[in-house]
Structures are given as structure tokens and as C-alpha cells.
Amino acid sequence: MLGLEHQTEPEKQMAVRVIGYEGANYRNQYKAKQITPVITLVLYFGTEKRWQYPQNLKALMDIPDGLESYVNDYHIHVFEIAWLTDEQINMF
């Protein structure tokens, strides 16, 4: 399952949104014999500023000492479309 999230403005809590989308999809697969991977790509089309917000969940948190190893992290995949080099564009 592939999801595309289109963004024209950076969003600080995007990792939380993507977790919600993917979690809902996995929840729908709860009773399936086999779980299908869910991949969400964030396509950022902003031209005025680069994506400067965290691309993982832990970076959004203030985790107390000693608990970090118990907190699951989650990474999102952000592609800054307007900032691709000509070389990168030619790969497609």
C-alpha cells in the first residue's frame, strides 16, 4: 500500500499525521492472514523554504532520561520536490 501526502507548507508534526494514516491502514488489516506493508511518502512542493522540521517521532518529544530505549521511534520520508537538482530529476 502506497500513500502520498502532498504538502505545500512544512508541518512540524507530520510524523504524527503519517503514523495516524499508516496505523489506520494496518488496523484495517488486523484480521488478514498476511499484513501488507504501508509506505507513505510526503511530497513537499514548497518553494519558499526547505523542510526544516523533524522527520522522526522522537525528535518531537522531550523524553525523560532512561526512557528513550522504551519509546518507539518512527521515521517519515519527505521528498522536497521543488528543491531537486537537475541530476536528481533526470533519474526519473
Give the residues covered by each predicted segment.
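Conserved single-residue anchors adjacent to enzymatic active/cofactor-binding motifs
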Residues: 1-92
